[in-house]
Amino acid sequence: MINLLESIDFYIQKGYEDAYATAKVAQDIILSKIANSNYRNNITVKGGVVMFNITKDKRRATVDIDIDLIRYSLEDKSILLLFDKLNQIDDGIKIVVNKKIKQLKHQDYQGKRVNIILKDSFRNQIETKIDIGVHKNLDIKQEEYMFNFEVFNDSMTLLINTKEQIFVEKLSSMLKHGIRTTRYKDIYDFYYLITEGNMDKSLLIKLINIYCINNISRINTTSDIVNELSRIFNNPNFLENVQNSRYNWIGENTNIVLNTILDFIKQLEPLVV
């Protein structure tokens, strides 16, 4: 049987900060329940959890759990049914769901936030939240990824957003928010994906057309993307924040990071139609 406090201490001993150790335990439990359920092909994992797993870098650890539903309803009753089924997985952990599910509506995202409590048989409990959206474009294929759940000493496969989709969704969000963006860590995610991600450029171009060029009114070419990013990157407030060390999880010079991003988008220009 899993002891939540012992599991948290396990990750602390491996070098995680307390909050991230607690979050990692919650992520392991929730994702392993999904992997062991009939919903494993109806859910794709996204966001910081994926970035942390593909980078294998504790500096990119996250407290968030973000998933998208595939061919499954986002209605509250459907979400509650999903968690009810996950609760039937016999792993010694019970999920208590706050039934006041919050509607999330942002410029580039609509979904639901579910606050949950995980309880073990030793009367320990931890809280976490899960943001749930919908994977609407079924033509955008998801990738199978092997997660290592150290709490269970096991590995299991789940669907995740591809690196290319992660990159372009972050890019689309930044273009939509412009200089008002607060997603400074995304800058360093871009750099990692460009330099280490070995992205498929043909897929990247396809997604840039879907998410950016065909979806944002003022963006018609990659030149428009470069110009908008340059405007953002030269904004004094943005520069001050993005240089904060708590966002720079890769430890690279910020000017090098920003120039690498711009150069990468520029060299895609002849390929985007």
Each language-model region and where it sits:
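Glycine-rich beta-strand-to-loop/alpha-helix junction loops that act as flexible
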Residues: 45-49
